[in-house]
Structures are given as C-alpha cells and as structure tokens.
C-alpha cells in the first residue's frame, strides 16, 4: 500500500535529480519514506536518493518496491504548476500508479522491478578532503569549464579548493580559499572528471545552499546535498578519468 500527497515543484526537483543518472529506477517504499540507489549504464556515476515521509503533505505506506519510468513522470510533472499538489496511490493488483495533479487524473503503468538493474553496492571510500560550498558557485565553475574542455580537474591544495579546465589553447580556473567556502577539510586531493557527467549532476545544485564534495587523489568524488527542504538527500558518486602517462 502506498498513498501520498506532495508539492509538485518539490517532487519535480527530486525526480530531476535522479533522472540525470538513469531513466528507470526501483523505488523502495516503506513507512519512513522512499529510497533509490542506481548506477548509470556505463558504471561511471551512481546516485543514492532518499526522500523522507516528512517531505510529503500526506504519506501512508507499507514496505514495497515499484519500477518507474522517470521520463514519464517528468513529462507528467511538466504540466503541473509549482504550487500544485500531486496525489499518488498505488494499485498493486494492476501494477498501476494513480496520479492526480492540476485537476488531471493519470493512470501510470509501472515497470516490473526485476527488469530494472539491481541496486548497486555503494563502495566505502576514504576520501581525505572535504569541501562545502554554495551550489551556485559549483554550477558556475562547471558552466565555465564546459566552454573550454570536456573534462575538469578538481582538487585541494593547502587551504584552497580549485576547479580547472584546460583546452587546446584556453584554460579556466576557479580558486576558493577557506574564507570563501562554507567549510574545508584539507587533504591530498586532485582528480579529473568528465564534464558530460558533471554538467548534469550539478544542475540540481543551483537551488542548494550547501553542497559537500568529498575528494581524493585519482579517486571518485562524492557530491552530497539535501533536497526537499532538508527532508531528503541525494548523493552522487562519480568515477574519475584516469590520464595515462
């Protein structure tokens, strides 16, 4: 059993944060909320998503798992006004999700969860450096880097966090000292990442006051931030691009 009501803009932002990784997901539902762990087809990026029951205006659920096509949900929410309420109810026997929004009623066919890639195992990484910054600053640096290159270097040197992109003739670099950051735990960190992935991953951070980056040397980066006014969280784990000598 699953029956819930939630603000349309909040749900739209949550779905968008997941959709940058995969098109189809397994929603694990229980009385405490909804969670997803998913990895992209190339095994480069992983998303870990949690949306607590407190994010909803109404929430009543037993433990269950449903398969969802995120593109269909995105299209459906595209016609909703930001202040609309989205009401959802699961029809378990028919494998349908009933959705009411903006006076319109939808019957969404669900996917068989067994046909969707199983939850990945989340690796336990010791990442020595941690940077906390405003989401808009991260988005700005990535946007600038896109114009120069297809990858970006991110690292920590002494008390400075830097993001750098180099093209054939041009380069761009943003440095942020401890006093410009919300928090900094210095450590050896310098890794190269694909902007094809970073560009999509940082899109949801534009509305976020605090984004935490955990880094190492030639290690994956963990990008972590709250959603739904603190009632949810999403973490992205992005593998580095290793340059051969």
Swiss-Prot record:
Pfam families: PCNA_C (PF02747), PCNA_N (PF00705). It comes from the Archaea. The keyword DNA-binding applies. Homotrimer. The subunits circularize to form a toroid; DNA passes through its center. Replication factor C (RFC) is required to load the toroid on the DNA. Sliding clamp subunit that acts as a moving platform for DNA processing. Responsible for tethering the catalytic subunit of DNA polymerase and other proteins to DNA during high-speed replication. The gene is pcn. SUPFAM superfamilies: DNA clamp (SSF55979). Belongs to the PCNA family. GO terms for molecular function: DNA binding; DNA polymerase processivity factor activity. Keywords: DNA replication, DNA-binding. This is DNA polymerase sliding clamp. GO terms for biological process: leading strand elongation; regulation of DNA replication. Signal peptide: none annotated.
């Amino acid at each position: 059993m699953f029956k819930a009501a939630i603000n349309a803009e909040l749900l739209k932002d949550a779905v968008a944060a997941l959709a940058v990784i995969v098109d189809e997901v397994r929603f694990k539902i229980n009385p405490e909320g909804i969670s997803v762990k998913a990895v992209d087809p190339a095994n480069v990026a992983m998303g870990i998503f949690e949306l607590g029951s407190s994010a909803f205006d109404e929430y009543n659920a037993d433990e269950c798992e449903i398969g969802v096509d995120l593109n269909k949900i995105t299209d459906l929410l595209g016609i909703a006004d930001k202040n609309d309420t989205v009401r959802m109810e699961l029809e378990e026997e028919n494998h349908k999700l009933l959705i009411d929004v903006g006076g319109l009623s939808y019957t969404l066919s669900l996917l068989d969860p067994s046909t969707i890639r199983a939850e990945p195992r989340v690796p336990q990484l010791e990442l020595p450096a941690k940077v906390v910054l405003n989401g808009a600053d991260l988005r700005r640096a990535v946007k600038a880097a896109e114009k120069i290159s297809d990858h970006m270097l991110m690292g920590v040197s002494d008390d400075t966090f830097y993001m750098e992109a180099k093209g054939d003739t041009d380069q761009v670099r943003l440095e942020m000292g401890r006093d410009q950051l919300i928090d900094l735990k210095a450590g050896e960190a310098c890794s190269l990442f694909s902007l094809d992935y970073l560009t999509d991953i940082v899109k949801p951070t534009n509305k976020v006051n605090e984004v935490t980056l955990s880094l190492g040397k030639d290690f994956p980066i963990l990008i972590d931030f709250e959603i739904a006014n603190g009632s949810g969280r999403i973490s992205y784990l992005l593998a580095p691009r290793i340059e051969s000598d």
